[in-house]
């Protein structure tokens, strides 16, 4: 994955992947047909249950922040891979070759439960059904990542994702991030 991050998806060849992994091309071709298969494998083996530690979830101060911890983990993965690579994954999704959204929506059941809890405690003031609202948080984050890719990484992806999620939820003011937190969100 490192060579995708440094060179970008389009510029990486199978030779580059083999050189980075220190394997023969024949070894590569026993597992994969092409570089798209590497991306497909990476996304098919990304699971929400593996992406966030229980410690991170327990440390969050409320259920909305737990949703943020989960969502931010996906943002972090995309930021680690870079906007060019992330954009290539989005293009492969549009072409029907991988399904980034399926992986992202693997957290929907969690988001529905956490949204319901937040509505019951008054953290989320939106009265939309949790079954509709929970998955919308994922869609909104995906759209925010799209903007980040489009700007070649020159877009405050974390601050915008957090602010948009707060607005979608009609989050109670005491749970919203401060201006300072938003300004520092992308310096992580």
Label for each model-derived stretch:
Residues 1, 17, 42-46, 50, ...:
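Generic hydrophobic, amphipathic alpha-helix propensity
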Residues 48-51, 96-123, 131-139, 146, ...:
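Amphipathic alpha-helical packing segments from all-alpha helical-bundle domains
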Residues 41, 52-81, 130-137:
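Hydrophobic alpha-helical connector segments
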Residues 3-37, 41:
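Helix-turn-helix
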